[in-house]
Amino acid sequence: MTLSLHGMGVSRGIAIGHAHIIERDRLDIPEYHIEPQQVDAETGRLLEAIALAKQQLRAIRGHIPAATSPDITPFIDTHLLMLDDAVLTQEPLRLIRSARYNAEWALLLQRDALVDVFDEMEDAYLRTRKNDIDHVVNRIQRILLKQKPLRHEEPDSRLSGYILIADDLAPADTVLMQHHSIVAFVTEYGGPTSHTAILARSLVIPAIVGMHEAGRFTREDDLS
């Protein structure tokens, strides 16, 4: 039986390579209350995670070749600015101090509140920008939860010549793909105005978005 999957080509080109599937762990965010004497340590833990997230993004920005399209750096800079934005960072700190929530849960509550605001926007393009919030918050949460880096984020990753398959990609993921000489990528979600599509065109990497179930029906190292 032949199975056909359909998506939207958003960047020109043809590529053949073995598949590498990004399987992001579903982050299990704990919810608990801390003791009054733990508040300072918990706020410090969140601030340290934010600082490390900035450090990671600056390192990724440093991988952008000088000859690359100027459209790329602003995507990383946007995420860096969000990490400095009081709207994202100060409310979780307040929740830690006032309600004595753990850092992960306080951050999740603020993420949900901000996403609700974006969901109510009439402009379809602006609604999709809630993905920026998810990408930034997920980076902080992975640090707080001490999650292992994904393979394509590891400095010694050997992915040259691979085709990356993922549910979605953050701008930082897309930049690292070029750094590791990944030849193409496929995402299950996204459209022609998504970050993934815009960056693929800027980086001149063949790409297909919106190919639902691509990860489910592809095995690691399949020739694609």
Feature map (PLM): residue ranges:
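Non-catalytic, soluble scaffold/interaction modules
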Residues: 1-224
